[in-house]
Every structure is written in C-alpha cells, then in structure tokens.
C-alpha cells in the first residue's frame, strides 16, 4: 500500500508541476502557442512519466532503507542519533561567529553555503564517531548494552533453554553439571515431568518409589541452589500421549535443547531435528585418556581370566587388567599403562606393576 502511495504521489506531483510550468513561459512564447490547454496536458503527461520513474526509484530506496533500519540494532540507531545531534550542535556553535561578521551583499550566499556545508560535515563526523566509540558510550550508560548489541548483530548467539527429562533428574548428575557451569541458561522442568516424578514417588513398587523420591529430592535441591536457572514450565499437551513425545514437542516449540540420558529418546529427538545434550555422552567425553606409560593408583579386586592377571576398576567403571597382578588381589598398588582397547562393551586398559616392567 505504501509503495503505491509513494509512486502515485510522485506521478501527481510531477504532473502538477508540468501542468503549471507552462504558465511560467515568457509572454512572447505564450502568444505564439495557439492551444495552451493542450500544451498544459502534454507537459503534465510528460512530467508524469518522469514522476513514475522517480517514484519507482524513491520506492526502491525507501524499501532498502527500511530493511537496513530493521536490521540495525536499536543501540546503533541511538548512538548515531546522539552523534548526529552533537555534530549539528558543534556546527552551529562554530559557525555562529561567522554569521555575525559583516559580509557584503554580493557575497551573501557565503553564509547559507557555510551553514549547509558545516552542518553536513559535522553531522557526518558525529555519526562516524558514534560508530567508532558508540559501544563504549553505551557501556557507560548500560553495562549490558554491548551484549545486547552483539546478539542483535548475530556476533553472539543467545543461550537456548534446556528442557530436562525425568531420567536426567533421577540420575542426579545434573546437579554437579550446574554447579560447575557446564550447563548454561535456563533449565526448564515441564509440569508433565514433575507429574511423572510424583507418580513414581507414589508408586506401589519399591524401586519406582525410591527413584521418584530421589528425583523430587534432587529437583528440590537444585531449585534451592540455582533458583535463577531452574524454571518449572507450565506447558502440557493433552493431545500428546507420552512424556517423551511431549518433551520433543516442547523443545521444538521453544527451540531448546533436550537434556537427557535416555538413549532411545536421544535417537527419536535427533530424527526430529531437536538438539540433544546427553549426559552419558558428556560423561564419556570427559573421561580421562590414559596413554602407554601413564601411572595409575589401582586396587586389585579379583583375578583375571589368565592365571597371572589381576583386575581392578577406575572410578568411572573402566576395567584395568594388570599383568602379574594376581598376587596383589585385595591391595592397592601403582601400575603403569601398557595399552588400551576400545570394545563394544566399553574401554579396557592393560597395565603392569613397575616391578614387572623393570624386570
């Protein structure tokens, strides 16, 4: 609608100019024209064509300017406006003495020329300074403005909210992850997850009841320790049957990350293009890597498959097979890693006591 208004306004304006400009012709020329009315309409038609071309250019320029303004952060617009005002004020203050000087009549054009030129130059300098030092200026006013500006420019990405499922709460590892800062942003606990925890806590099955109460205790603990991070989300989807499907739908709806340690839920969510943060994958990624020659403090728990072997376990559950470790069952000793093997069941480390390596 606005595009049509710009074009029509330009056409009618130029047509009116063409219609009226005929009357500005010298009287001697008008006396030679037999049909002034026809000339007026001819001039109006010619000028309307020019008006159409200028209107199209104005409409295109307006749209480009509008898109640029929409994409420009409000902080940038504000700093440029301040720079423009300051530049114009300085221009007027500096040019005021010149306006007071007596200037001969034949040079009277100098004053308006200097006023226009000085205003344009100082306005441009003010905007340039605002672009260069605007962020520093905005930080003095609002310390959080720089982050807002970078987010608007796309330089920084906002932290998406995390949607936590029941298994992740019961697991309990979410608490140290929050404490160490590995999980940033808001953590949403949907109302239907809270209801599922309550159902488990009220279950007749002892194992389910223990899991449900553990989940509620952990949730209460992290809510008390991190009140700004934990948010109970009231969303519920009565038309969706399962809790897993509701979790995926909520994560899609708010463009969030699904926080879980459920393998099947992770696969289903990935198929639906939902970003996943699997706690088990994170634990696997941060497990220490032992290279041949590294030293371990290990307690030998049992004998291995071969007669001379002893077996122990690291804190993360990794099995360590110690050659010549049978005689150390039940005791702790220092062992040296000789090799590591990744199997479908997990990682296995082979080691030997220093005395065996020395011999």
Curated annotation (Swiss-Prot):
Pfam families documented for this protein: PIN
Domain TRAM: 289-350
Keyword terms of this UniProt record: Hydrolase, Magnesium, Metal-binding, Nuclease
EC number: 3.1.-.-
Residues annotated as domain PINc: 163-275
Function according to Swiss-Prot or TrEMBL: An RNase.
Name listed for the protein in its UniProt record: Uncharacterized PIN and TRAM-domain containing protein slr1972
């Amino acid at each position: 609608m606005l595009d049509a208004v710009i074009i029509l306004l330009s056409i009618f304006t130029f047509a009116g100019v063409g219609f009226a400009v005929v009357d500005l012709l010298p009287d001697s020329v008008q006396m030679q024209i037999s049909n002034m009315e026809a000339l007026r309409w001819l001039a109006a038609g010619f000028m309307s064509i020019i008006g159409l071309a200028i209107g199209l250019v104005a409409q295109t320029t307006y749209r480009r300017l509008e898109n640029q303004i929409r994409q420009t952060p409000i902080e940038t617009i504000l700093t440029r406006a301040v720079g423009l005002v300051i530049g114009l004020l300085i221009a007027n203050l500096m040019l005021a003495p010149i306006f007071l000087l007596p200037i001969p009549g034949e040079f009277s054009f100098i004053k308006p020329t200097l006023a226009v030129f000085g205003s344009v130059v100082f306005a441009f300098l003010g905007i340039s300074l605002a672009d260069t030092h605007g962020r520093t200026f905005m930080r003095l006013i609002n310390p959080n403005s720089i982050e807002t500006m970078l987010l608007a420019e796309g330089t920084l990405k906002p932290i998406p909210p995390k949607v936590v499922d029941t298994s992740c709460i019961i697991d309990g590892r979410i608490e140290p992850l929050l404490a160490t800062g590995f999980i940033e942003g808001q953590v949403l606990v949907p109302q239907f997850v809270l209801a599922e925890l309550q159902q488990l806590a009220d279950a007749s099955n002892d194992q389910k009841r223990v899991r449900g109460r553990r989940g509620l205790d952990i949730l209460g603990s992290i809510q008390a320790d991190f009140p700004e991070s934990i948010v109970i989300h009231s969303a519920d989807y009565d038309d969706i049957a399962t809790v897993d499907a509701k979790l995926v739908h909520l994560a899609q709806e708010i463009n969030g990350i699904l926080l879980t340690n459920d393998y099947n839920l992770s696969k289903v969510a990935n198929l639906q293009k939902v970003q996943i943060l699997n706690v088990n994958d994170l634990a696997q990624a941060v497990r220490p890597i032992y290279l041949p020659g590294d030293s371990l403090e290990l307690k030998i728990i049992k004998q291995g498959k071969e007669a001379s072997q002893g077996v122990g376990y690291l804190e993360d559950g990794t099995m360590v097979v110690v050659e010549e470790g049978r005689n150390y069952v039940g005791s702790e000793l220092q062992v040296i890693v000789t090799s590591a093997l990744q199997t479908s069941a997990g990682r296995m480390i082979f080691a030997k006591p220093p005395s065996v390596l020395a011999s």
